[in-house]
Amino acid sequence: MNFLENILVVSIEQAVAAPLCSSRLADAGARVIKVEREEGDFARYYDKDVKGESAYFVWLNRGKESLVVNLKDKNDRSIVKNIIQSADVYIQNLIP
């Protein structure tokens, strides 16, 4: 059952805590948009065990959409801001 089917989650995430949290929300049916830097989440490059992709990355990011942006670019920041404003849930685990 997809309890969170109509919920939009936007997550600017890396490492473990936020990706694990948002993957659980995706498992429950939420639409999760993972915002990534241009070079991609560093976890993408840990290994190439799952059809050339990192097992860790695939496990923590299953069921998510990915939006690649440069947060230093004004236009990209505007896009992210608009998406966050339409989200039901916003997750981030960046340095304060």
Specify the residue positions occupied by each region the protein language model found.
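N-terminal helix-loop segment corresponding to the beta1-alpha1 unit
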Residues: M1-P96
